[in-house]
Amino acid sequence: MEFSVKSGSPEKQRSACIVVGVFEPRRLSGTAEQLDEISEGYISNLLRKGDLEGKSGQMLLLHHVPNILSERVLLVGCGKERELDERQYRQIITKTINTLNETGSMEAVCFLSELHVKGRDIYWKVRQAVEAAQDGLYSFDSLKTRKAEARRPLRKVVFNVPTRRELPIGERAVSHALAIAEGITTCKNVANMPPNICNPAYLAEQAKILENDYDKVTTTIVDEKEMEELGMGSYLAVGRGSVNESLMSIIKYDGAGDDSKPLVLVGKGLTFDSGGISLKPGAGMDEMKYDMGGAAGVLGAMHALVELNLPINVIGVLAGCENMPSSNAYRPGDILTTMSGQTVEVLNTDAEGRLVLCDALTYVERFNPEAVIDVATLTGACVVALGAHATGLLSSHNPLAHELLNASEQSGDRAWRMPLWDDYQDQLESPFADFTNLGGKEAGTITAACFLSRFTKKYNWAHLDIAGTAWRSGKNKGATGRPVSMLTQFLLNRSGQEQGE
């Protein structure tokens, strides 16, 4: 799909389709009014007859409108003008693109980017439109033998901006959006891959592909032998029950061209989580292939980063592992020695993500990082607390937390900060080891982050719990690509190349 921007009046557009908005109740947007005037009231006459009310998401496709150069006009319901918000805007764009894809139009000029969305500028509207369009067109069908195809797939969409002065802003928005969308697609493709294909070795292969494709990237793989030498007893214990070797992929992006401190992203990469000896219930266990969503998100963010060619140093860590039951698996009651030297009593082998992450978080101390952000499908408690809309954010460093919250608002990939008070640390106490890997039934998301915080004393750190946001269940099951957009926005902001609100 090709995207671009232009600045022009609707009556001069010669296209397969021109897209304009209609508000509720039957109120034409400014662009639609111009088309109505040229067509001598053709559009407003249809609205008076009740063909379109203007409710959000309604679509009406018109052919051969009098005096209009374009073959088709697509009227898009945008709801009440004053109530159009970010969520509605994205939904409208997604439905518009899907509708266009079914009409047989191979290209279209879209004026929805001129709609007023409260508090948002043209950069945001164009970027969100491109990201939403790419998201709506995504399908994971690489393993299907029969693939559905649109009769004449949409190939090009042009978003209109109000003035020529805004063209450079719109062009930058398209450029940023395409890079981010590419990262999101990478994240989705890897996360959606079945666990018999996507194991830790597969994750490592994907990390190596980035090195092969981009000059500023180098990738190294830490195998179990090296983990043993490093004393990563916690990480190794989790993978002990699987025939698939645990592998940690280190992706280094040297964008600054100097020795400035890197930002480090650490992704939990449990390519399948059966729960181990503390076996999960059978219902929905197929979705535990998504327990590597953190690693997929970091890989996607690194892909977007290299596409954007940002002038900063970033390291992505994919902590690949598989948690399986076997005679060699670790057990409840085991006491593990982590890379940091701290000991952990295992109360439940299904609280394994933190055991992998704690050693990865200790490992990254060697990079003398500017900041470390770990990303993990860590706790079911986060799904209970925040549902599928907000990623859980916990941090021991207020400025970093505020940066991430700002990036989440800018990108529309929302997060919500939860407390990380010392009061919760007591729930991890153990009579036999330094602490346990489980904090009890209460405040599960917070106690999991409290556990991780004990391994992050040497740098500024934040934790993103994406258990509720990494994938969708049900009929439309699949990876969402989150939090690639938020992470990339954070990196854009850090590089000084952000644009927009």
Swiss-Prot record:
Catalytic activity: Release of an N-terminal amino acid, Xaa-|-Yaa-, in which Xaa is preferably Leu, but may be other amino acids including Pro although not Arg or Lys, and Yaa may be Pro. Amino acid amides and methyl esters are also readily hydrolyzed, but rates on arylamides are exceedingly low; Release of an N-terminal amino acid, preferentially leucine, but not glutamic or aspartic acids
Name assigned to this protein: Probable cytosol aminopeptidase
Binding site for Mn(2+) 1: 273, 350, 352
Residues that, per the record, bind Mn(2+) 2: 268, 273, 291, 352
Catalytic class of the enzyme: hydrolase
NCBIfam families reported in the protein's UniProt record: PRK00913.1-1, PRK00913.1-2, PRK00913.1-4
InterPro entries: Leucine_aapep/pepB (IPR011356), Macro_dom-like (IPR043472), Peptidase_M17_C (IPR000819), Peptidase_M17_leu_NH2_pept (IPR023042), Peptidase_M17_N (IPR008283)
EC nos: 3.4.11.1, 3.4.11.10
HAMAP family hit by this protein: Cytosol_peptidase_M17 (MF_00181)
UniProt-annotated catalytic positions: 280, 354
Domain of life the protein comes from: Bacteria
GO-annotated cellular components: cytoplasm
Function as written in the Swiss-Prot or TrEMBL entry: Presumably involved in the processing and regular turnover of intracellular proteins. Catalyzes the removal of unsubstituted N-terminal amino acids from various peptides.
Organism lineage: Bacteria, Pseudomonadati, Pseudomonadota, Gammaproteobacteria, Alteromonadales
Requisite cofactors: Mn(2+)
The keyword Membrane belongs to this UniProt entry's keyword annotation: no
Taxonomic source organism: Colwellia psychrerythraea (strain 34H / ATCC BAA-681) (Vibrio psychroerythus)
Subcellular location field: Cytoplasm
Keyword set includes Metal-binding: yes
